[in-house]
């Protein structure tokens, strides 16, 4: 199975927290149906990722092989575009990444609740393989993203309306999640030793 992939970045510090000095690699899925249909998230600035034809079809095994060759850490963030527009491929990619012991973070404009309403069986397979989901539409009026900031949380999350959902203890038999709202109340975010999510301090 292939993924329509726009690009990837290796060993960067702007793709979320990790246990390895906040280094992660990032995979950019090409295409966002919401944007292509004329209804992008308000203020979305990833224009080059909207169009599916901007990507190249790459096999899932080739993607993992490239990460294994080039990554110094086993932490990966999957963004778009919209990764869940390629849901079957996303699930298979995450299953393979998990076999290689990667910590997986996925960012989607779809909410967790909408995902379950849309295709409960498939999304539960996805949740069973990933560690963290950042969900919800980007809203420029609630922007917290700052690519000049040394703060890890603000270097990869777009706006305060988005939720951080800890799926580290989720399984098909034990559907445990912990959801964090209003994340701007926290100073920063980190990954616990067990792979779950933690937050530092409060801005209030």
Describe the function of each predicted region.
Residues 85-95, 143-201:
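P-loop/Walker A phosphate-binding loop and immediately adjacent motor/lid segment at beta-alpha junctions
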Residues 3-5, 10-58:
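Canonical Radical SAM [4Fe-4S] cluster-binding loop centered on the CxxxCxxC motif
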Residues 60-68:
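Short, charged beta->alpha transition segments
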Residues 63, 116-123:
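Short, acidic/polar
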Residues 42-58, 72-86, 100-118, 127-165:
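Core AdoMet radical
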Residues 62, 88, 92-99, 125:
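Alpha-helical scaffolding segments of alpha/beta enzyme cores, especially the outer helices
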Residues 20-22, 71, 99:
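Short gly/pro-enriched beta-turn/loop segments at secondary-structure junctions
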């Amino acid at each position: 199975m292939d993924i329509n992939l726009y690009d990837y970045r290796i060993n960067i510090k702007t793709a979320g927290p990790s246990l390895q000095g906040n280094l992660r690699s990032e995979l950019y899925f090409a295409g966002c149906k919401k944007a292509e249909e004329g209804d992008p998230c308000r203020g979305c600035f990833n224009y080059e990722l909207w169009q599916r034809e901007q990507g190249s079809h790459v096999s899932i095994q080739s993607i993992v092989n490239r990460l294994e060759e080039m990554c110094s850490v086993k932490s990966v963030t999957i963004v778009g575009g919209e990764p869940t527009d390629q849901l079957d491929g996303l699930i298979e990619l995450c299953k393979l990444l998990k076999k290689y012991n990667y910590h997986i973070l996925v960012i989607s404009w779809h909410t967790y609740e909408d995902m379950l309403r849309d295709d409960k069986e498939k999304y539960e397979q996805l949740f069973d393989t990933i560690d963290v989901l950042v969900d919800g539409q980007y809203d420029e009026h609630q922007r917290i993203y700052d690519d000049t900031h040394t703060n890890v949380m603000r270097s990869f999350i777009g706006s305060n309306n988005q939720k951080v959902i800890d799926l580290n203890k989720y399984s098909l038999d034990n559907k445990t999640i912990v959801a964090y709202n209003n994340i701007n109340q926290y100073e920063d975010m980190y990954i616990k030793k067990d792979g779950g999510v933690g937050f530092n301090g409060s801005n209030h």
